[in-house]
Design a protein with these regions (language model features):
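Electrostatic cytochrome c docking/interface patches
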Residues: 27-64, 132-136
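Flexible coil segments in periplasmic/lumen-exposed cytochrome c-class electron-transfer proteins
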Residues: 98-102, 134-185
């Protein structure tokens, strides 16, 4: 950029900064109340911080899943048009020479939620804030614990009699935890 253009750009930036310096604040919006903030402050951390009270079993989760989730994810978490929820590390092994071709042909069969998510608490967090797709945040905390328990069972990470709550859920070891880079210790 020639020197004259640099000078003009510099003068323009200095003028724009000075012109805005004396302008009053815009003052849009209003402060959130604690109740409003609490509705949105629902992030669950890998260590279980911010998990709500409640509990849910695999058996309860199976019934809720069939009513609320199976239409999109399939009866067993592998048949639906939406993301695969259950299964192994994917249909295609890392050593499969045709892996790239198969992935392009069957993109939803690569990784299940149980194989790619590093923390069980992330499943709870996602289900609570985003599912079911047609009515996000409509499940109670007990229902979310139950659906999470069922999804973990579909992935053979917990037994058929498992009950998830704020103590049990963070203790579930996910297969991807060891192969993930995380900001959480």
């Amino acid at each position: 950029m020639p020197t004259l253009e640099r000078c003009l750009v510099g003068l323009l930036l200095a003028w724009a900064g000075a012109a805005g310096a004396g302008a009053p604040a815009v003052g849009l919006g209003e402060p959130l109340t604690q109740a409003q903030l609490a509705r949105h402050d629902i992030t669950v951390f890998p260590d279980g911080r911010n998990l709500p009270p409640g509990r849910g079993s695999v058996t309860e989760g199976r019934a809720i899943y069939r009513a609320q989730c199976a239409a999109c994810h399939g009866e067993k978490g592998i048949e639906g048009p939406a993301t695969r929820l259950a299964g192994s590390d994917g249909l295609f092994g890392w050593d499969d020479p045709l892996r790239i071709i198969r992935i392009k042909k069957y993109p939803l069969l690569i990784w299940s939620m149980g194989a790619r998510w590093p923390y069980a608490t992330s499943i709870f967090d996602y289900v609570r804030r985003a599912m079911p797709h047609t009515a996000p945040k409509s499940l109670s905390d007990d229902q979310v614990y139950a659906v999470t328990a069922y999804l973990l069972h579909l992935n053979e990470l917990v037994g058929a009699n498992a009950v998830m709550d704020r103590q049990a859920l963070p203790k579930v070891k996910m297969p991807a935890q060891g192969r993930s880079v995380s900001a959480w210790p």
